Structure formats: C-alpha cells, structure tokens
Regions:
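Conserved strand-turn element in the central/C-terminal portion of the radical SAM core barrel
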Residues: 1, 34-36, 47-73, 96-112, ...
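Core AdoMet radical
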Residues: 1-52, 57-61, 89-96
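Aromatic/hydrophobic pocket-lining residues that form the small-molecule binding cavity
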Residues: 2, 41-44, 74-77, 119, ...
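Catalytic cores of alpha/beta
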Residues: 2-11, 57, 67-82, 142-152
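Short, hinge-like loop/turn segments at secondary-structure boundaries
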Residues: 14, 35-37, 78, 153-154, ...
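Conserved, mostly hydrophobic/aromatic
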Residues: 19, 51, 81, 126, ...
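Generic structural signal for helix capping and beta-alpha/helix-loop junctions
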Residues: 26, 68, 166-167
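Auxiliary Fe-S-binding modules of radical SAM enzymes
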Residues: 75, 86-215
Length: 215
C-alpha cells in the first residue's frame, strides 16, 4: 500500500499497522519472494514509513527469527525502529519477535536454531536499546516462557489465536465459508483470552485489552 491508500484506513477504524519484514538478508529475501510487489525489498522496507505518512497512529516491526542469521536480523530490526522513532517521535512503535516454527506440509523450510535463551537475550536487548517501544511475544512460544518474559520486558501478549486461513471469518460470522485452509504455523500457547486474563491477574498484573483512547 502507498501513503494515499493508508489515509483511508483511519476512517474505517484502523490506525495501527504491523509489517513483518521477515528477514533483512536481501539474498535470502529474494529466494522466498519470487513474484509480486512483496518481492521488491526496498518497497517492503519502507512500508512502515508510508503508513506513518498516511496518518496511521503507530507501526509494528518484526523479523522472523530463524530464516537467516538471527544476530543480523535482530540488530537490523532494532535499527529500523530506532531510525523511524527519531524521525516520527509522535508515533507509537512496537516490536514482535516470532521464531520460525515448523511449517505444516512443507519440509523445505527448516528453522535455524533460535533457542529460548537466545530469544530472551534478544528481547532484553530490545528493551534496553528501545525503552519506550511495545514488545509483543507470539503464541508460537509456550505459556511458561510467555509468563516469564512478561515479568521482564514484554508488554503485549496475544491470546485466543488461530492461524488457520479463514478461521476468524467462520468464527465471527458463524458461517461455513468453505475457505479455511491449513494452519500457517503451530501454536504453542493455546490459552483463551479469558484464561490468559486470569493467569495475568493471579501474577499480580493488570491486563488491558485496549491501551489507548481517542478523546
């Protein structure tokens, strides 16, 4: 989408966009995206800035750790945020740190090893380097890890997640659309919103389903 396209979204109720860069390794990126606009790496890289120019309240960033050298991808993600945070100080910024999971029906893509210890180090480094950004921890991680990292540096935790193509449409419309597909990746933390809410409260935290209001 171009900046002009993003200008329509706030009127429709959307004011935040997250773009998964996937990897900042240009050679690896080209092997994964063979066709379409997404193949043009600079256009993908500038997506968050186009969204901000189009009037979006905030933007999110992420590399898919394990696609390429996670050291370089983690550093590049942080520098990407750092650059735009100083260029657009009024905007809200957030980071997500998903690890590549085994892909159903696809044996060709195997995640490079990113252990829980490594992931924790990356998340803590993000918090130190970018103290004011939101940090989201994916449901790709198990409940034990997510509960622990929420005590250290994470600010956003998803719940009630479905990765099946078309699952949300059927859930909220109550209709069998016939459009559902395989799950895009395996989920480790399957807790519902109610269950997650209760677990956070028991640990002395105050869960918030919305962290901003327009006045």
């Amino acid at each position: 989408m171009n900046s002009e396209d993003y200008r329509y979204l706030p009127a429709c109720g959307a004011d935040y966009v997250t773009v998964f860069q996937e990897t900042y390794d240009l050679k690896k990126y080209e092997t994964l995206h063979l066709l379409g606009h997404k193949r043009v790496w600079p256009y993908r890289f500038e997506a968050q800035e186009r969204a901000l120019r189009g009037g979006m309240r905030g933007v999110g960033f992420s590399a898919l750790l394990g696609l390429s050298d996670y050291h370089k991808d983690a550093l590049a993600t942080a520098l990407h945020v750092y650059y735009l945070q100083r260029k657009y100080p009024q905007a809200e910024f957030s980071l997500s740190c998903p690890r590549l999971r085994p892909i159903i029906n696809n044996e060709k893509i195997n995640p490079l090893d990113v252990s829980e210890k490594v992931l924790c180090q990356i998340l803590c480094a993000y918090r130190i380097f970018l103290p004011y950004v939101g940090i989201t921890v994916s449901s790709r991680e198990n409940a034990r890890f997510r509960n622990g990292i929420a005590k250290i540096c994470a600010t956003k935790i998803s719940a009630g997640v479905s990765t099946g193509i078309g699952d949300h449409e059927e859930k909220y419309t109550g209709r069998d659309t016939g459009k559902t597909g395989d799950e895009q990746f395996e989920i480790s933390d399957t807790r519902s919103i109610r269950s997650m809410y209760g677990d956070m409260e028991r640990e002395g935290r105050q869960p918030a389903l919305n962290d901003y209001l327009y006045v």
